[in-house]
Amino acid sequence: VLGGDPDDLAELLAGPAAGPVPEGAPVLAPVGGQPVWAAGVTFLRSRDARLEESSGLDAYDKVYLAERPELFLKALPGAARGPDRAIGVRADSDWDVPEPELAVVADRRGRIVAYTIGDDVSSRSIEGENPLYLPQAKLYRASCALGPCLVPVTEAPDPADMEIALVIERDGAELFADRCAVADMKRSLPELVDWLWRGQDLPLGAVLLTGTSIVPPPELTLRPGDRVRIAITGLGELANPVELVDTTGQPGR
């Protein structure tokens, strides 16, 4: 669909295959062969948190103010987890957090056609040790979740009116909760998508996570068994349990 015209998505959602999900059926991440990218340091609070975790390195301060945004690959095609699928924390990390984000879905020409909810699960201890470890802190098995569905831009609220809410639960109780406004983002959504499409071909389109302003305190780290719930105005709620990702396996296993 994302390799075609913008109207294709609306036609598909209005077609005979559309309808409620059968009870008990698993819900996958609402993407197919699209890669998931992410933008970093798009909110002031995110910049401050990255500076704190990185012992005062000023690279994050510079990218917050720069014309060119930070963009990185978050999940290979087919790797994002859907609703109620487990997200992972690395066994070789001791500080892991969810990053609740508005995800924009763009077609092959870079036109934003839909929104969904994204969770950019991250190892702050690995990234904080050295910024060059960013791919290991961000891109690993079960580090990305998307869902619960795609909402076409024609049916979604204006992003300026969207609010992101995060709740982390442990042992059935609320451990942490916070919320932020998408309107507080320093960069615009079309600006971020434009930078992503520069110099590369994305024939099936792409999903772009657009950053977060919700940063759990340093003493909080995700543990296996926790549950992460993210809600965005007009897009529903994405909920995922947390599991441990084994990092001791041999290559090729």
Locate the predicted segments by residue.
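Active-site microenvironments in enzyme catalytic cores
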Residues: 6-172
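Catalytic-pocket segment enriched in acidic/His residues
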Residues: 124-253
